[in-house]
């Protein structure tokens, strides 16, 4: 399983049980929204030590001119930090060691996407036709990226644009931003269905990422999250409230018409 998908599952749970014995061990908080730092393979903005500790992963943007040697040097500098690539179309030759691949072209071959050993995330336009939006949940990808770049502040219109996509799919939706959103916006982004933020490293300081990390971990759970955790832990079946056994007895008499 992709490490990214595993982290998304953990984020949905909000808390993880640390290693150890006994039920008294304190459960560690997990950010409800992942934070991935984005930078160009040919640029010099890859994360330094401080930012690495504040990120859940990195996204390396590549182009048709990105050399394999340059990408290998870049990924080596990331150490153990999970990373993925972002290109116009999936490029197997440039994805050695990558946990996931983001691509933008709707003309990508289905044969490429049939490789079960790779995790594909598709970048889609917010302006996508309503009819096409209804089809995205059945596409052979693991999630979607939408972009709001050069936005000074988030507005209700932005939330409605995001909601057109997030409410049309059960798969995780990532939001790509030039700048880190304000703390006041984070709850709205979570509630509208954003699973991860992809934030440009070049535009944001270590201090800004530190504040984001703290704000996400301190974000209160939604009431229905607490209730769902309670329900799911008490019963494996939650769809039907009526658990009466309706299986007919072998000795029941049935009237013949």
What are these regions (language model features)?
Residues 98, 122, 137-142, 148, ...:
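ATP/nucleotide-binding catalytic cores
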Residues 31-40, 56-62, 79-87, 100-103, ...:
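Hydrophobic faces of well-ordered beta-strands that scaffold small-molecule active sites
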Residues 203-256:
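C-terminal helical cap(s) of enzyme catalytic domains, especially alpha/beta-barrels
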Residues 1-83, 246-257:
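Conserved N-terminal beta1-alpha1 strand-loop-helix module at the mouth
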Residues 46-50, 89-97, 127-138, 179-197:
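Catalytic cores of alpha/beta
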Residues 62-78, 88-92, 100-118, 128-132, ...:
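Active-site-adjacent beta->alpha loops and helix N-cap segments on the catalytic face
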Residues 85-90, 128-135, 173-176, 221-234:
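Short, basic, helix/turn surface patches
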Residues 28-31, 49-54, 75-78, 93-97, ...:
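Flexible, charged surface loops at secondary-structure boundaries
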